[in-house]
Amino acid sequence: MASVKRNFLFNILLVTSNIVFPVLVFPYIARILGPQGLGNAHFALQFSKYFVTTASLGIPIYGLREVAKVKNHKAKLSKLVSELLLLNIITAFLSFGVYAIVLYSSGTLAQNFDLFAIASLQVLLGFLAIDWLFAGLEDFKIITVRSLTIRLITVLFLLFFVKTKNDVFPYLLISILSILLGHLWNLFYATTKVKFSFKNLNISAHLKPIFIIFLMNLCIAMYTIFDTVWVGFLSTATAVGMYISAVKLSKIGIPIVSALGTVLLPRSARTFAANINNPIHLQTSFNFIVDLAVPIGVGMFLLAPELLFVFSGAAFSDALIAMRLLSFLPLFIGLSNLFGMQILSASGNDKLVLKSVFIGMLINVVLNVILVPKFAHNGAALAIVITEGIVTLVTFYFAFKKFAIRFNTKRFARDFAACVTFLPLIWLFKTYLTSPSLIIVGSLTACAIIYLSLQHFWFKNEFVNQAIVTVKKKLNK
């Protein structure tokens, strides 16, 4: 339990940086590059990221699970990591070849050839992304230290080199190089954990179990990564910029909601491997997700105009509808990760996850083709919300059917009831304050105090109560 708490604290620190970094950087970048420049850069980033996902074959999920099983056997661990790395190197080069062919043959991509060319670096070197090794080893300290260091360097470079709306290429280059620097850091540190050797390897042994996860990842990527690409191909660069602005803001809450699940995933894999079909920590994870995602969603929906103005600028006001549509995305994604990753995938039921995300992919493709040409970024936002909602329901159905795992769904009603108090509070701040920044700060502070007070005094929330006990112990020392 101590290791879970320690890793959770490191993950919270990482999550905090995941929030602080966009909060510091995105408002600056959005105002400098504008909707069109931001759209062009992220069109290239997301398009190349799809090929990175293809090349990864599902190794991040499979590797984490398998590393967790052999973490205490260094020889087996070294062989496993070497085999998966070699396999990823092969697929990365194949994916890079396909990327190059598509780039040279597409008229749409050729309009910004330099951007897509520099983005190809993350396709070619994507095999160096081995966070799955450290997550499987439950070594979240290295992931956190690396991320904080590189993000600090990235912020400094962005402030120094991105100064006008014409600096789209420097922005993209810095973004790509920061990713690659993180990969190299991973590889260097990995040499202290495993002994790499490319002799007597058997990569074919991993192909069958990885194949299902590979298909699963492709389906997921079609609606979590390719959503931006749909807007780029079926609408305009400006629409991409609007969509990215809404998505960036709505997804700020996802790392918070997923923090506990990320730490517990290796433990879920070991628990199911030991034939324990109803781990207690799953209810804890469910409660944690709902308790955080519900107020985050309600708050984002009510404060969407002010959030967009402060973090993106007046030029992104057309993203308001998309922002409100996406406000409950953290809830859907948090729960689908619980049902899909922590339960079905961790227990080896990847085929059921594949069925779930395949259904989601088909629905998303149809919705994007219908909605994006007519409603641009708003259509893409509606498509992804419907898709994530359906995937959440389907994964829950399979998890319940397979293990008869039950969750306290009254948690939803309780948390939404607590959030009803947000309406008059935020209305008061919007009525008597004119500064969007002050409205946000005042509303968040007041709503957080009321929500936590209700959770503690009225609902006896275990997370809030434990936090208070911990703080009291620290103060009494």
Locate predicted features:
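Interfacial segments at transmembrane-helix termini and the short loops linking adjacent helices
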Residues: 102-119, 300-335
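N-terminal membrane topogenesis motif
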Residues: 1-23, 75-78, 191, 200-216, ...
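Signature of the first transmembrane helix
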Residues: 3-61, 96, 100, 155, ...
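Membrane-interface junctions at transmembrane-helix termini in multi-pass inner-membrane proteins
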Residues: 113, 123-147, 328-359
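Helix-loop junctions and terminal segments of transmembrane helices
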Residues: 27, 56-72, 250-293, 340-346
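Membrane-proximal transmembrane or re-entrant/amphipathic helices at the cytosolic face
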Residues: 427-477
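Interhelical loop/hinge segments that connect adjacent transmembrane helices in multipass membrane
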Residues: 144, 168-175, 184-224, 263, ...
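Hydrophobic alpha-helical transmembrane segments
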Residues: 120, 144-192, 358-363, 377-398, ...
